């Protein structure tokens, strides 16, 4: 079963885009979307005041309420192999109850492996390979090495707790977190979605048609390249990020510490100011720069 929850650990909408791609390509029903085999009671988990669902106001009345849905769908990969997809908004509350409900699904459908997808914003350039953090509740499941050394204290998530609880209950679970350039974290970044699904293929032995995601990723990269070619100041910041990334990579290969490096690296504040303009240029017309890529 593949898990992708919206709301957290979804920089660049990587997990949400990946889930939508799976629904679109793995549906076995004529009307698309696959068969919903389990539905969670969202009222038990959702904080409507924190994440208000959109509604439509048509002149003098309300209509078109987009109710949040947290469901499990039966899908099929490119070779016809069946698998489940749990997707929807991350529960705001009652995480333990959510984990127990997922356990019921796992046992009811004899799920042998749960694979989660996520993404985090990182100070990395889009011109370098997307790094993936591998994690699992059973070390035998790991399909790659972790880029981290030692321990980190990080904010928890429902997906992370689910992996922990499933391990305690004797069920296998693993996941992948893509590192998305932080200046692209608010945009759809299909390149990260494709990287996540490539890892899902390896872990789950599914065959997923990634052609459409590849096309979308190439189009996004072309948009970014056009924007940077017309905005030298932002290009300079990306170049600084590349230098920072390569400095860390060299130090990692040589086993050196960066604490002794004399090379000045751009600060988060410096990058943030530049990337506010970057995001504005990609999302809409930039009056001060003569337009943005389409």
Where are these regions (language model features)?
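Predominant activation on well-ordered alpha-helical scaffold segments within soluble catalytic domains
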Residues: 16-23, 103, 160-163, 167, ...
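Hydrophobic/aromatic beta-strand patches that form the interior of the parallel beta-sheet core
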Residues: 38, 84-86, 115, 172-177
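Internal, conserved structured core segments that host functional sites
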Residues: 81, 89-140, 162
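N-terminal short beta-loop-beta anion/metal-coordinating cradle
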Residues: 2-88
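A conserved C-terminal secondary-structure "cap"
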Residues: 184-294
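Catalytic cores of processing enzymes, dominated by hydrolases/peptidases
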Residues: 123-203, 207
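Conserved active-site and cofactor/substrate-binding residues in soluble primary-metabolism enzymes
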Residues: 10-17, 93, 97, 157, ...
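Flexible, glycine/proline-enriched loop segments at strand-loop-helix junctions
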Residues: 5-9, 85-95, 145-153, 183-187
